[in-house]
């Protein structure tokens, strides 16, 4: 290689190096391209809903009658000691009936409490106007011991429940009205000494006992509407011989329906325990006052 060729080669190398240099200083750091995008990005999944808030615990309901007394009741079938086996039936047979008395009322025993012939069995000697007879809690008297045969009570028993009115009538002299629990017709009244029967269109039968029979507000065969007055609470009662029998001032209330204890047994038309049906009706009455 000649000297001229060496000079030209050196010049070319110098020009190539100059072209690669960055004018003004340092070479910048390379830019990070970041993660590569996937070829087939996944679709976002469904958004998980927030868990449901737990239902609030309902507040306990306290109901009071017109005198400010708090309503309460002993469980169905839980009778006074020494008064009978009771009948455990929580069925509300007629949820829409009206309570059969216009005013406040107290369900409890007329025989095994103060004023009753067997009150001494529970240390309740005294007369029927004893204050505790006219207070809560209610207590069931269906299947209370009696000599009468009753399909619900294998040993015989009380066919309905006993309801004291708001006040003790011999002491207060007040009038307390019994009313129709449903629309219906008064049946079998002629010749009846102490019972008024109300039958509904579907055959359900109610019996009201011990009303003041010579001052009834209804007649035999009369159609009545729910809430219509039937008669005044009293103590009319007679034995099978027609003799007057003493009893306390109260309404004895019965309900007859087709009843079968299970699916294998044919139903019979007989008394059913109205206690829980009346509890339901009374609670509705207190809420509406």
Label each residue range with its predicted role:
Residues 9-13:
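Hydrophobic alpha-helical targeting segments used for export or membrane insertion
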Residues 1-8:
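Bacterial N-terminal signal peptides that target proteins for export
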Residues 156-171, 200-204, 255-265, 272:
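Small beta-barrel nucleic-acid-binding modules, principally OB-folds
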Residues 156-158, 172-220, 238-250:
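Zn2+-dependent peptidoglycan hydrolase active-site motif and core
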Residues 199, 222-289:
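Conserved, short, structured surface segments that act as functional micro-motifs
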Residues 54-194, 226, 282-289:
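Surface-exposed, glycine-biased beta-strand/turn segments
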Residues 18-19:
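C-terminal motif of bacterial Sec signal peptides marking the signal peptidase cleavage site
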Residues 23-54:
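Ser/Thr-rich, Pro/Gly/Ala-heavy low-complexity intrinsically disordered linkers and tails
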